[in-house]
Regions:
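Metallo-beta-lactamase
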Residues: 122-155, 180-181, 190, 285-339, ...
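Cytosolic regulatory regions built on CNB/CRP/Popeye-like sensor folds
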Residues: 433, 445-713
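Short internal beta-strands
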Residues: 279-289, 417-422
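Di-metal (Zn2+ and/or Mg2+/Mn2+) metal-binding site signature of metallo-dependent hydrolases
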Residues: 249-276
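Active-site metal-binding loops of divalent metal-dependent hydrolases
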Residues: 28, 207-211, 235-238, 261, ...
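Non-catalytic propeptide/linker segments at domain boundaries
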Residues: 121, 127-214, 218-221, 226-231
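Catalytic core of the metallo-beta-lactamase
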Residues: 316-372
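Cap/insert and terminal regions of metallo-dependent hydrolase folds
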Residues: 1-131, 138, 360-449
Length: 713
């Protein structure tokens, strides 16, 4: 932890000030409780909400009060004090209702298509009421609102000062706290692979084995690999950076299974949504609507807007859903909020995930006797699929979690197939010698199932690559058939030159796995290419010589298409039109600008390449107003040379120079007016993306809405 200007910065984010009332924490990104648990002063009992509760650039909630509340109330028997505005109180209550007690109104019949004798739809409201008891949000924590921009706790006064907080103690100024909170991921990686990871046909990679109160281990979450694609289950908040540091391309994961809305299971979901492409989330309608209400409250965005950022695939009780060839049969677990587990079948192998679940038969019997569940639900819970080949089962603190002693009482054959997660190492080891095994995180510890390739595997993999290329979506079936007939596969060793500058073009390349680098003298940095990215199209479509060297940065697996076949394939297609546009607008000066500008720092090279294809040069030689306050933003502007003045209604002036942006994709998408007037006092050169093109780009990459541009535009 670093100390500055009267406060301490927590490693993951947020600030702590020592006062006469004890430590006060400002902001709470996910898992900051792990930072404070090991300190002398412990977890602060007073927490101040940040000025903005959601950090869109990181895709995370930075006002995660769930675990501080759980810790103080359920472990210490205290009611923490949370401070913020009255509007934040309202929003926090909405979010915590979903996270702590679950939705107020729901009907699991919405999660079933076929309500018949062979499809049992439980009524879990009694179970949720059993776990809730007499608790209310008011019984869990205290809330103190700011009045006229200030609040007092004992001798401590906290005042809102613009975007920041001023803290005085006993009349003495002690700290100025930034009101906007960032997040820094902290996690163990394990042994990173020397070469990029190649996803297996069927496997499981544990991202973390433990729970949200364990400062020593990663929080639980895992990836299921099916037909060489990844399905992330309950992504931890750091999952994407974990993958990158482990030498795993995050683009292999195109789907999420969301089991419930506790912070240690849903906190990383929006991080994944804000990556390249459009992610598909699989869950029930009940859980999805709860998730949207929770994050609408934290982010301040409407539920309708959040829905536009990803694809939702509803799953149903009693109707298995197929994801990458695996059949998922879902069921509702026994927990305090709606929570689903699933049994997965793939090529004769089975894997079951309990999710958070109270699996103790004695507790279930008590709930039956007290009328919290009916006999049919009790019988369903008693018939957990212990016969599965691999059992991923949680264990934790009662009453919400399965006690380890119950799992240790299972027959040895069942124990030997059971992997226990959601538990700290010290707690697992305390049970003594058993046949159980604790989940082992790390890409090097991926569990591989023995399977055989299907007769269609090569075609499936080729089509999977095809669908990942954004512009192939509009191809008719006959073109897809043609694609399968014209492709070849090629391997390149690390360091091997694939394309030489000045040579004639003979192939179009698509990367299946591994990395390549584009090397050209006038680029400020070589372009990095990874899985599902392509190259070599310029020389084929223009007849010109190759314009750069491309070298295999790792061992590389590619799909290639010979020149004549490629030209015939793209002729007259939307794909060909888009490729030609990319070629026409590609410019090394534009690329260098996008690489050098902080405005595009969080974009991948592939996203920069796509953005580059939409940008048009625009120049004004005389002073002029570019966008007036109140006008609809016609598109996105990037200053490439010159200066643009920004004036607000109060007469304040600032300037935008090279790499600066006018507009914000989020506001452009919603056709909202500009908040400031932008004008040039002399010659200025810019790059411009019209609103129609911006909407097309956003549809393919929804996460870009919060990553490009000035939020204040």
């Amino acid at each position: 932890m670093s100390e500055k200007r009267g406060y301490v910065e927590l490693p993951r984010g947020g600030c702590v000030v020592q006062t006469s009332q004890g430590p006060i924490q400002f902001g709470a990104p996910p898992e900051t409780i792990k930072d404070s648990l090991g300190t002398e002063t412990g977890v602060p009992e007073i927490l101040v909400l940040p000025r903005e509760m959601f950090n869109w650039s990181k895709g995370i909630n930075v006002a995660d009060m769930e675990f501080p509340i759980y810790y103080h109330f359920f472990i210490r028997g205290k009611r923490p004090l949370i401070c913020g505005t009255m509007e934040q109180a309202r929003l926090l209550a909405v979010a915590l209702q979903e996270a702590v007690f679950g939705p107020k109104n729901f009907d699991l019949r919405d999660d079933s298509i076929d309500i018949s004798d062979d499809v049992f739809v439980p009524d879990i409201r009694g179970e949720m009421a059993f776990f809730r008891g007499e608790l209310t949000l008011k019984s869990l924590f205290r809330y103190r609102p700011f009045k006229d921009g200030r609040l007092v706790v004992g001798d401590v006064e906290i005042a809102i000062d613009g975007d920041d907080y001023e803290v005085r103690d006993g009349g003495r100024h002690v700290a100025t706290i930034p009101g906007r909170i960032t997040y820094t991921a902290r996690f163990d990686v394990g042994d990173a692979l020397p070469e990029p990871f190649k996803p297996p046909r069927f496997g499981v990679t544990c991202l973390g084995p433990s729970h949200g109160f364990d400062p020593k281990d990663n929080t639980s979450g895992f990836i299921i690999w099916l037909n060489h694609n990844g399905v992330m289950v309950d992504p931890p908040v750091n999952s994407t950076e974990w993958l990158l540091r482990s030498n795993v391309n995050p683009k292999f994961i195109d789907s999420i299974v969301l089991t419930h809305c506790h912070a240690d299971h849903d906190a990383g979901t929006f991080q994944k949504i804000l990556e390249e492409g459009r992610v598909t989330i699989y869950t029930t309608k009940t859980i999805m609507e709860s998730f949207l209400r929770k994050y609408s409250a934290f982010s301040g965005e409407s539920v309708d807007y959040l829905r536009r950022l990803f694809s939702f695939q509803q799953v149903f009780i009693g109707r298995p859903v197929t994801i990458h060839g695996g059949e998922f049969d879902i069921f509702y677990a026994l927990h305090s909020i709606p929570t689903m587990g699933f049994r997965l079948s793939f090529q004769g192998k089975t894997f079951v995930y309990s999710s958070d679940h109270q699996g103790d038969p004695q507790v279930q019997r008590t709930m039956l006797d007290q009328g919290a569940m009916n006999r049919e639900r009790y019988e369903q819970l008693q018939h957990f699929p212990w016969e599965s080949d691999v059992i991923y089962h949680e264990s934790g603190i009662a009453p919400l979690h399965t006690p380890l002693k119950f799992l240790a009482s299972l027959p040895e054959d069942v124990q030997s197939r059971t992997v226990v997660y959601h538990i700290a190492s010290k707690d697992f080891n305390a049970i003594g010698e058993t046949a159980l095994q604790r989940a082992t995180f790390g890409i090097e510890n991926t569990l591989y199932f023995e399977t055989e390739p299907s007769v269609y595997e090569d075609a499936y993999r080729a089509l999977d690559i095809l669908k990942r290329l954004d512009f192939f979506e509009s191809l008719p079936v006959k073109k897809v058939q043609e694609f399968l007939s014209i492709i070849e596969r090629r391997h390149f060793a690390r360091g091997e030159k694939i394309i030489e500058e000045g040579s004639k073009g003979d192939y179009f390349y698509i990367i299946e796995s591994g990395n390549a680098i584009v090397m050209k003298e006038n680029l400020v940095r070589g372009k990095q290419l990874g899985a599902f990215e392509y190259f070599g199209e310029v020389a084929l479509l223009t007849g010109s010589d190759r314009t750069a060297d491309i070298v295999a940065d790792t061992d590389l697996e590619t799909i290639v298409i010979p020149r004549d076949r490629f030209l015939n394939f793209v002729s007259g297609t939307e794909f060909g039109r888009i490729l030609q546009r990319v070629i026409d607008r590609r410019d090394n000066r534009t690329w260098n600008l996008l690489v050098e500008s902080d405005s595009f720092a969080r974009l991948s090279d592939y996203q920069r390449m796509w953005l580059e294809s939409y940008l048009e040069p625009l120049a004004y030689s005389e002073p002029r107003t570019i966008v007036a306050e109140g006008d609809r933003l016609p598109g996105l502007y990037i200053v490439s040379d010159g200066r643009v003045e920004v004036r607000d209604g109060d007469g304040g002036v600032r300037s935008i120079e090279r790499g600066g942006v006018i507009g914000y994709l989020h506001r452009i998408m919603r056709d909202e007016p500009a908040r400031y007037t932008y004008s040039s006092s002399g010659p200025v050169e810019m790059l411009f993306m019209p609103r129609s093109d911006a909407l097309e780009l956003i549809d393919r990459n929804p996460g870009l809405t919060m990553r490009i541009g000035d939020p204040s535009a």
